[in-house]
């Protein structure tokens, strides 16, 4: 028999790149999904500096097994900030509704540069800047903030994610940004309380 159902909402997708070059969010749109949320697992493509394009592609390829060659060919990088990315998406039309979250890895590398990629501890100034950019992302329409502290998430080169060793004060700083925004979700994948523990 057949079923009549409302549209399904897929709260965990990685269409962050595909949404910049395709109006079809397939295969989800082929299966009755009418809304998707992307920016999960702390990986995504904004905010980004031109020098960090390859790193963000390596993260998405490694964490989500999305071919780097497709991302390299498809991403136009016509944005830098997360609000710019949201504006870019807003100019496009899709076969379903999409929502984006601000990814911690991109945010951390944007603010801290190589120190962030190398998993060095964030300073109070770094945290304040990440917090402010998260507030701005929420004002631009982000649904929330995502992070990952799991050893299973690695770049395509096998390196741990920039967020693996993010400390509690850094994560609390991002949570306080959501409080300031007055809304949003915080999604985090974590295998441990402390890396050494």
Regions found by a protein language model. Give the residues of each.
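Histidine/acidic residue-rich metal-binding segments in metalloenzymes
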Residues: 83-94, 119-197
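Flexible loop/turn segments at secondary-structure boundaries
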Residues: 16, 43-47, 106-109, 152-157, ...
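Di-metal (Zn2+ and/or Mg2+/Mn2+) metal-binding site signature of metallo-dependent hydrolases
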Residues: 3-27
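Divalent-metal coordination cores built from histidine and acidic residues
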Residues: 21-144
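A short, structure-level motif marking secondary-structure boundaries and short turns
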Residues: 8-10, 71, 117-119, 159-160
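A generic secondary-structure micro-motif detector
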Residues: 13-15, 75, 123, 164
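Short, small-residue-rich loop/turn micro-motifs
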Residues: 1, 102, 106, 149-151
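A short alpha-helix capping/helix-coil boundary motif
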Residues: 2-6, 111-114, 151-155
């Amino acid at each position: 028999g057949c079923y009549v159902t409302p549209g399904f909402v897929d709260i965990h997708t990685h269409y962050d790149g595909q949404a910049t070059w395709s109006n079809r969010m397939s295969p989800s749109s082929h299966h009755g999904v009418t809304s998707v949320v992307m920016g999960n697992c702390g990986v995504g493509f904004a905010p980004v500096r031109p020098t960090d394009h390859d790193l963000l592609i390596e993260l998405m390829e490694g964490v989500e097994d999305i071919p780097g060659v497709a991302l390299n060919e498809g991403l136009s990088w016509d944005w830098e900030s997360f609000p710019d990315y949201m504006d870019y998406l807003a100019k496009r039309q899709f076969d379903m509704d999409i929502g984006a979250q601000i990814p911690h890895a991109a945010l951390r590398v944007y603010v801290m540069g190589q120190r962030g990629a190398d998993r060095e501890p964030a300073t109070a100034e770094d945290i304040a800047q990440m917090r402010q950019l998260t507030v701005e992302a929420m004002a631009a329409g982000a649904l929330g903030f995502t992070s990952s502290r799991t050893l299973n998430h690695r770049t395509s080169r096998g390196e741990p994610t920039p967020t693996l060793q993010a400390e509690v004060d850094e994560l609390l700083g991002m949570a306080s940004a959501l409080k300031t925004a007055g809304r949003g979700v915080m999604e985090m994948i974590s295998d441990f309380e402390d890396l050494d523990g």
